[in-house]
């Protein structure tokens, strides 16, 4: 997950304008106090026919928020589409199927994962993502333009020239960027990367699961140790007479300790070895 930020050049944030910015406006935005590089990342939200859902269409992104192809290939014709893998699984869609998006019937050529939509949040204010009724997809530039501007969102992604050291610095830098953009054009949405659930939910969820599993494993180890201690204590108490006889026969304390601990220690070692082999393979 962490490697994906560099591998797919994930954005430092995105913003949406009321109208498309011209080249002069983009240059002014990039040359603020915080130097940034701005990329067009326009999208369309369209209803689908075969399944009750909304799908967000993007052009192929080659410079920012790059795409991971999970199956098949990206669309090359103007009647083709590549859709998010999770959205496809939830709606029982596969490569080769047809999907009507808006007023156009398209062939699914690939299943993809968009690096800025690792969790399918359609809106940053949503409490939970919905991978059943919302998905993202890639279409050709020509097909994207054919849909017109009726549902077009003028969304832009930016990347800092100098990467912030932590979230606190990222917040300060984002506030400066937002104020600067507001002085140039009309902002309708502004989402820094550090607060974007669509990017960070998956990583945060994995981190939470890892913490929970670690605590659970420590508890299991304590419980197992307690069970072994009780079992060994009861065994020694039951065999006190036998132990006394063995001691009188010349057996040392060390030999008796090794005798009674051998079985549980063998069980622990075998379990640890098998568990590690299964866990790492």
Per-region residue spans from a language model:
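Membrane transport/envelope proteins' first extracytoplasmic loop
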Residues: 1-225, 234, 253-254, 267, ...
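Conserved G/P- and acidic residue-centered "switch" motifs that form tight phosphate/ATP-binding loops
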Residues: 96, 250, 275
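Short alpha-helical segment immediately N-terminal to, or the first helix within
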Residues: 98, 245-246
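Short hydrophobic/aromatic, small-residue-rich stretches within specific transmembrane helices
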Residues: 227-230, 260
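Small-residue-rich transmembrane alpha-helices
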Residues: 229-241, 265-281
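Amphipathic cytosolic juxtamembrane alpha-helices at the membrane-cytosol interface
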Residues: 247, 251-266
């Amino acid at each position: 997950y962490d490697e994906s930020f560099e591998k797919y050049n994930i954005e430092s944030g995105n913003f949406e304008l009321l109208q498309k910015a011209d080249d002069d406006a983009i240059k002014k935005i990039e040359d603020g106090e915080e130097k940034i590089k701005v990329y067009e990342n326009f999208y369309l939200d369209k209803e689908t026919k075969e399944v009750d859902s909304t799908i967000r269409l993007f052009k192929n992104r080659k410079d920012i928020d790059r795409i991971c192809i999970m199956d098949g290939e990206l669309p090359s014709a103007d009647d083709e589409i590549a859709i998010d893998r999770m959205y496809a699984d939830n709606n029982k869609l596969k490569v080769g199927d047809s999907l009507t998006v808006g007023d156009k019937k398209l062939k699914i050529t690939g299943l993809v994962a968009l690096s800025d939509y690792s969790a399918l949040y359609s809106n940053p204010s949503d409490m939970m993502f919905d991978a059943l009724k919302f998905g993202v997809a890639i279409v050709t530039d020509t097909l994207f333009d054919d849909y017109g501007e009726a549902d077009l969102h003028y969304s832009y992604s930016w990347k800092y020239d100098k990467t912030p050291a932590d979230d606190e610095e990222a917040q300060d830098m984002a506030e400066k960027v937002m104020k600067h953009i507001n002085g140039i054009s009309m902002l309708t949405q502004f989402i820094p990367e550090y607060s974007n659930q669509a990017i960070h939910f998956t990583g945060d969820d994995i981190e939470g699961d890892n913490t929970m599993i670690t605590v659970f494993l420590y508890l299991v180890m304590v419980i197992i140790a307690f069970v072994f201690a009780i079992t060994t204590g009861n065994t020694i108490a039951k065999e006190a007479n036998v132990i006394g006889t063995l001691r009188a026969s010349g057996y040392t304390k060390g030999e008796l300790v090794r005798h009674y601990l051998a079985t549980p220690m063998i069980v622990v070692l075998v379990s640890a070895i098998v568990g590690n082999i299964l866990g790492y393979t």
